[in-house]
Amino acid sequence: MAGEMVEMEVNESAVGSSKTRVISYLRNAGFLEASDSIAVEEPLAIDILGPDGITVRAGVIMRTPVMDRYLVAGFLYSEGLISGISDIEGFEGVDEDGVSHQNHATVKIGKRIGFNVNSRLLNSACGICGRSTIADLLIRHGKIGTDTRIDSETILGLPTAMGRAQALFLKTGGVHAAALFDVQGRLHAVCEDIGRHNAVDKVVGYTLLEGKDTDNSVLMVSGRAGFEIVEKAFLAGFPIVSSVSAPSSLAIQIAEAVGITLVCFVRNNRFNIYSHPERIIP
């Protein structure tokens, strides 16, 4: 059944992900006061501690402080700074609830990493600046060629299933979401964040740290499907990306080149397929 939840191990109601503020609001030409829940946005500094004892700043991300462990792992993987979970020896500055309450996380890496910090993008708002070409992506991860297929009715049920699990959005109205579904439409995880790319990195980190399969999975996102969303999905091995909103031209180009089925405008009992439609069963 589409939207059946099988293992929601991810807790989006973590303390610190929202704050309450007294606001004034307009009703009937007059102002009233009420409490409003606000999504938290705070910086997270990510450092890498290599085997030589040298610490390098990998980035500073503006994020909602929940599931930082997944965010850090997904970010480092998407950036090509780790090749898999085996590269990570441990986390410092991340508490048992998976959150860095000091807004500073250090990842112990068991291999030497060489990269130019100044040439890397440290802002989660853009993906292509100084980054990958299609050829570079295909070097890191071969073209997706799975024979995975999914029923149209299952695709249509994904937004509702994701929306019901978006606890932080329902509370604040101020965050994006990314979700991991299998091709039977069963929901495995929903990750929310003030940044839509962060939400995807959290899903990617979840699959890495929890050992979840992506070969027969769908990445569902609540916002538009831009280049970086498709790039992250490809590097994580997702054959299908689904969005309730529009794709960008570059996202379509990347999806077509790397073998991803890109399905957008999934709403009101309809959707558009922009690349590799052979995976969708009418």
From Swiss-Prot:
GO terms for molecular function: sulfur carrier activity; sulfurtransferase activity. GO terms for biological process: Mo-molybdopterin cofactor biosynthetic process. It is found in: Cytoplasm. SUPFAM superfamilies: Cytidine deaminase-like. The active site is at C126 (cysteine persulfide intermediate). GO terms for cellular component: cytoplasm. Its main location: cytoplasm. Keywords: Cytoplasm, Molybdenum cofactor biosynthesis. Mo-bis(molybdopterin guanine dinucleotide) binds at F265, V266, R267, N268, N269, R270. Gene3D superfamilies: 3.10.20.10, Cytidine Deaminase, domain 2 (3.40.140.10). Belongs to the FdhD family. Required for formate dehydrogenase (FDH) activity. Acts as a sulfur carrier protein that transfers sulfur from IscS to the molybdenum cofactor prior to its insertion into FDH. NCBIfam families: fdhD_narQ. This is Sulfur carrier protein FdhD. It comes from Thermoplasma acidophilum (strain ATCC 25905 / DSM 1728 / JCM 9062 / NBRC 15155 / AMRC-C165). The gene is fdhD.
